[in-house]
A protein has these predicted regions:
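Conserved beta-strand-loop-alpha-helix hinge in the C-terminal portion
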Residues: 169-172
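Short secondary-structure boundary/capping segments
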Residues: 4-5, 53, 123, 130, ...
Length: 172
């Protein structure tokens, strides 16, 4: 089983030395380098680069630079999506963001995690669990969304939150 297959199954995998995963992250870094250096007025170029990088991009998508992610292809964003500056998505697993989602500055969405056992962690092993963010969600500044979390529809995540468990729809 390849490291990528292990990752997709939620198993521990080696993301540090696997050539396939390294090449895919390198591709994302190259696209992000270009994206993060575009002029503010270059809307068409930004959209084109997002469509090349991300797995799915709805209509009316704005991600303010700088933006960083691991692979890009695991990220799907719906219609009318806005993310302010310094969004970081560690997308070892799928990240699905619904329609009308708004993300404030300095938010981290992390599918990646590491073993609590130091010996395994020191081997460079990690896991990735998918994250789902529903429709009509607002995530406040400096919030962190951790692996495996589902955020329902019509949710507001307050600034500075660390989301470690599922949040039901219509919650604050």
């Amino acid at each position: 089983m390849t490291e990528k297959e292990k990752c997709r199954q939620g198993l521990l995998y080696d993301a540090n030395y696997d050539r396939e995963l390294l090449a895919e992250r390198e591709r994302a870094k190259e696209l992000l380098y270009d994206y993060n250096r575009l002029r503010p007025s270059q809307y068409t170029e930004k959209t084109d680069l997002l469509r090349s990088l991300l797995g799915k991009v709805g209509k009316q998508v704005i991600i303010e630079p700088p933006f960083n992610c691991d692979y890009g292809y695991n990220i799907e964003v719906g219609e009318n999506f806005y993310a302010n500056v310094n969004l970081v998505i560690l997308d070892g697993a799928k990240v699905t963001i619904g329609d009308n989602a708004f993300i404030a500055p300095n938010v981290g969405i992390y599918t990646a995690g590491h073993p609590l056992d130091a010996e395994r962690r020191n081997q460079g092993l990690e896991y990735a669990y998918p994250i789902r963010i529903g429709n009509n969600v607002w995530i406040g500044a400096h919030s962190v969304i951790l692996p495996g979390v589902t955020i329902g529809d019509h949710v507001v995540i307050g600034a500075g939150s660390v989301v470690t468990k599922d949040i039901p729809s219509y919650s604050l």
